[in-house]
């Protein structure tokens, strides 16, 4: 007899797992701090996964899935939790991935993020981007930053999300969260109307195309704080990705716009903790200092990493600098730090210097 959806999700939550994978021909599997492992000894059949999909989706979502073979949504079971769901076709079968969403919004301090995140989120205007691969914790970091703003400053925060993951409460700010496909048709429609809602802060769940990027730049230029995410691995790749949205002849203008409005690019990866208790965020921080703005305006993104390495006094850091700090504090192992490093050889040398007492990066 196949396990119930409730049974599997409860098991994932109890294990503090991140993702539940439901695929035909294999057992229900969870990704957690110990890696990926099956949780129930039952090989899923077509009818099992189809039944789970039918339970998760409403009539409208089923219609969209029938037309596109894709559906992304939020799903909640009382007493168990809230989940981000992706339902898709693979080799002619339905597949489901369910990611656990923490309904209690974490704080910047609880996530162990640098204190400069609190300063950045409280600036009055500009563009802040949080980047990283899928599953790197971008949404969690943004939620913590928004909660800090919500807790400390009055104003109006509007979010456009696909789907809503963390549910915020009104605190010092009024916060309105709009879900794509439920509260507005798509990002473009929501963004075309957002200024009518008199926001101080606009959160765009993800920038996927030129039109969304244009709105982000324009609203940052007109005095709003704009927050969003991109699927890019670091600051250099993020800047290159943004320019690739647009025709080549527009690049100089895009570089000038970015130099004017960009306030920070935060890139992150999740690395297993040395004590096997879970994963820790490793963050690269690029702050739009005068030197960075000059490089961005000229399109000289290749020099930005060196500038970050030399600007720790401004709150900047590279991935490898943060990995070195975490290794020094015993939070990540040498093996995992080197696996996540941008420059394995350089980080290894710095670690050897650190372990022999040589001065290193703070």
Task: List the predicted regions and their residue ranges.
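Short, flexible helix-loop junctions that flank or precede catalytic/ligand sites
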Residues: 1-362
């Amino acid at each position: 007899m196949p396990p119930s959806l409730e049974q599997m999700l409860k098991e994932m939550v109890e294990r503090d797992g991140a993702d539940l994978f439901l695929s035909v021909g294999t057992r229900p599997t969870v990704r957690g701090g110990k890696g990926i492992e099956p949780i129930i000894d039952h090989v899923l059949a077509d009818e099992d996964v189809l039944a789970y999909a039918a339970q998760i989706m409403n009539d409208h979502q089923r219609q969209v899935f029938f037309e596109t073979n894709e559906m992304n949504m939020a799903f909640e079971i009382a007493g168990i939790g809230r989940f981000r769901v992706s339902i898709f076709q693979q080799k002619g079968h339905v597949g489901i991935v369910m990611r656990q969403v923490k309904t209690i919004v974490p704080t910047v301090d609880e996530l162990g993020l640098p204190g400069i995140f609190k300063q950045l989120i409280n600036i009055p205007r500009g563009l802040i981007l949080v980047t990283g691969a899928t599953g790197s914790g971008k949404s969690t970091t943004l939620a913590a930053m928004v909660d800090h703003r919500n807790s400390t400053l009055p104003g109006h925060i509007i979010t456009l999300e696909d789907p809503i993951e963390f549910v915020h409460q009104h605190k010092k700010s009024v916060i309105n969260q709009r879900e794509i496909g439920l509260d507005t048709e798509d990002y473009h429609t929501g963004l075309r109307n957002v200024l009518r809602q008199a926001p101080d802060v606009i959160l765009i769940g993800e920038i996927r195309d030129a039109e969304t990027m244009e709105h982000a730049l324009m609203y940052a230029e007109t005095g709003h704080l704009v927050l969003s995410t991109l699927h890019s691995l670091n600051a250099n790749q993020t800047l290159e990705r943004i320019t690739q949205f647009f025709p080549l002849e527009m690049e100089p203008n895009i570089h000038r716009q970015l130099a004017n409005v960009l306030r920070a690019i935060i890139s992150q990866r999740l690395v297993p903790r040395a004590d096997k208790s879970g994963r820790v965020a490793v963050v690269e921080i690029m702050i739009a200092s005068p030197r960075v703005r000059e490089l961005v305006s000229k399109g000289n993104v290749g020099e930005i990493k060196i500038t970050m390495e030399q600007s720790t006094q401004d709150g900047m850091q590279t991935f490898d600098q943060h990995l070195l700090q975490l290794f020094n504090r015993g939070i990540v192992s040498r093996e995992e730090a080197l696996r996540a490093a941008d420059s394995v050889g350089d980080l290894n040398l710095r670690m050897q210097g650190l372990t022999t007492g040589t001065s290193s990066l703070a």
